[in-house]
Amino acid sequence: MKKLLLAAVLALTTGMAFAQGAANSKKGAPAAAPSAEEQTIRARLEQTFNLKPSKVSPTPFGWYEIIVDAEVYYVDPQANYVFNGSVIDTRTRQNLTQARKDDLMKVDYAKLPLDQAVRIRVGKGTRQFVTFEDPNCGFCRKLHNDLKGLTDYTLYIFLYPILSPDSTEKAKGIWCARDRAATWNALMLEGKAPPAAPADCKHPLEANLQLGRKLGVNGTPTLIFQDGSRMPGASSVEAIEQRFAAAKK
């Protein structure tokens, strides 16, 4: 379905979207959208693409923002054109689309089931964050090597075996080990494979996979901070420190 939607995007160029935004931004904030326009948009999208947006909202540049499966698109009031891409406020240089996506992808940190995660504490451990990681993830190993330069934190690792069947076996071995944190670090930092898990060992791997899918975690590592923001990939210590600082505000 997304391919169909992207095909419709070809009917509108990025330049046209920016021009439309510049022209309408001079008019100030839009008036309350007539319900008829929203009904037209919803009906047209459902009829053409079989899409049911979770939200349809007016924008400052005259078009409508539609949310479909945490993705952001834009349509004109008659739903004749669909635009998929970044809209930039030329006055502030802010990427309005990315800001909206970041907001949509925020996680309720307080509701994360941290009892399903491997806990690693460094120093006093006052600063917290969460990762979703696969035992066979090369970027995860890079992340943990970089974390040697980070102090005073508690990391909760949701074992998220999505790369191979072997990932599942290793994840079981880590969770069922006597010292989960040490076993994880031995794998990430030294390349030591975890011991095989006992056949009767209970683990939260399926629950972790369901949680990750619900949160839209598509790759490892994915980092989540206490303010609900997330950061994909092997992030630098500097970037993590910046997120810690932002989470305090």
Where are the language model's segments positioned?
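Acidic-aromatic/histidine active-site loop/patch
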Residues: K192
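Extracytoplasmic thiol/disulfide redox context detector
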Residues: K2-A7, G15-K172, A186-L189, A197-T220, ...
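Conserved NTP-binding/hydrolysis module of P-loop NTPases
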Residues: I174-C176
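Short strand-coil-strand connectors
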Residues: D69, Q226-D227
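Conserved, helical-rich catalytic subdomain that frames metal- and/or nucleotide-binding sites
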Residues: R178-A181, N185
